Structures are given as structure tokens and as C-alpha cells.
Amino acid sequence: MQDIHDFSMNGVGGGGGGGGRFFGGGIGGGGGGDRRMRAHQNNILNHHQSLKCPRCNSLNTKFCYYNNYNLSQPRHFCKNCRRYWTKGGVLRNVPVGGGCRKAKRSKTKQVPSSSSADKPTTTQDDHHVEEKSSTGSHSSSESSSLTASNSTTVAAVSVTAAAEVASSVIPGFDMPNMKIYGNGIEWSTLLGQGSSAGGVFSEIGGFPAVSAIETTPFGFGGKFVNQDDHLKLEGETVQQQQFGDRTAQVEFQGRSSDPNMGFEPLDWGSGGGDQTLFDLTSTVDHAYWSQSQWTSSDQDQSGLYLP
């Protein structure tokens, strides 16, 4: 009985010891697990622990969870200077957003040595600016005025050229003698204004057509371009003058210095001159115009004859 009790005691004790070892081991094993969990948690806390920024030494940093491209080199971000850096990597100077900040150039202000020396330069600059603005404002108006002046200049040149051609001196041509026709015959003489009786054509001068005709030159220094027209016009004007006034003389303005120049008074009633020129009845041969000279077989049959 004692042995069983000892065995039981030993067994219980052993069991207790085993249980104690078991539970002790369990407890001890639980302590080892806690240590491992603690170590893992410490590692996680170390990752989340705020690090100093290597650029500005600020503790306002964070670990990048999603923006990590390489787990062996975790990425951190500094909220102060807004820069990223990686552990064991190169510090980037590019800010978030990729903005490129250019360094502002400091403007060196030139201290004026003397105010009096700078005043003339400033006034000259103001004058230059005013001249540039005035030239810029008037450039459009000058361009439009140039086009208008060019057109008016061309028109003026054409008018002056025509005037020069008209006023150019032609040998033997007299501008005041614009009323001369033919070989120096005056239109007033042809109308009978220069005669004593006034002439038959004295009233024709009041018509506007005659006044318009008087302003047209027909001759140049007493010489016509077409000699036949000149002769015809001269003969007709002489006949009109003699019909209007038989005693009127035809005056030649170009030869007024010679008193003997001019036609002598013609008298149709006198025996002077060829009377056969105007008396056609004396030279008509009645035998030539008789019926016997124009008779023919055809006319006899038809009964028609020429007078």
C-alpha cells in the first residue's frame, strides 16, 4: 500500500512535476511567443516610427505604405519640406508634384550717383517713348494718307502734263488768235460785223453754235494740214462775204501791217471779171438739149424723152 501510495505520490508528484513542467513549459513557451510577437511589433513600430528628415531634420515625417517601390529600401516622406527619401538611397530635391522652382534672380539696383545727372537722361527717354508712341499711332493714318496722296499726285501729274502739252509753244501758232480760220480770216469779218452795212450774217453771231465754233482753231500760222480743205473753205467764205457785202474787204490779221493787202471791192455789175462764170444761160447750147439729140429707137417706141 505504501508503494502504491508512493507511486501515486510520485506519479502525482511526477505528474505534477510533469504538469508543472508542461505548464511551466507552456507558460515559458507562451513567454517566448510573446517575445517574438513583441519583436515583430517592435519592428512594425520601428517602421512607423517617425524619422528625422535628412534634409531639414524635422520629425514631421511618415512612412509611405502604398508608394513604396522597393521593400528593401522603404520610402519616407517629409511633410515639412515635402520631399521623399529612401533608407540608404539618394535624397531627392524634387518636390511633390514635380514642380521645378527656378531660383529668382536678384535685380541689382543701380544707385544713382547724382540726381541732376540722371534727370536729362530720363527726359530724353521720355521723349523717345513719346516719339515712338506718336509714330505708332500715326502709322495707320500715314499709310492711308500716302495712298490718297499717291492717287492725287498721279492725277495732278497727268493734268499738268496735258496742260504743258497744250501750252507748249508751236512754231507759227499764236494762242490769242484762237478765232482765226483759214489763212488768217476773221470770223467776225465773215459774219459782216466789220463792214459798214453790217452784212447779211450780222445776226448769226448771237447763236450759241457760232460762239462754240469760234473757239476752235482751224489753222496754225496760216498753214493748213490739208490744203484742199483750206482752198474750199476760203472760196466758200469769200463767196459768202461778197454776197453779204460787196464792198467789204477780207482782212488778214497776220498781215495787217501791209496796207495794200486784201481783196479789192468786187462789183458784179461791172464789166470786170469773167461774166461767163456766173452767167450760164449765155453759154448753153439749146441745140444740144433738143429732142433730136436724144432720140433713139427705144425712146421712140416708149414715147419717153429726156428734157
From Swiss-Prot:
Keyword Nucleotide-binding among UniProt keywords: no
Pfam families noted in UniProt: Zn_ribbon_Dof
Polar residues biased stretches: 109-123
Ranges annotated as spanning the membrane: none
Residues holding Zn(2+): C53, C56, C78, C81
One Gene Ontology MF term: zinc ion binding
The keyword Metal-binding is assigned to this record: yes
Biased composition (Low complexity): 134-147
Role this protein plays: Transcription factor that binds specifically to a 5'-AA[AG]G-3' consensus core sequence. Enhances the DNA binding of OBF transcription factors to OCS elements.
The protein's name: Dof zinc finger protein DOF5.4
The organism of origin for this protein: Arabidopsis thaliana
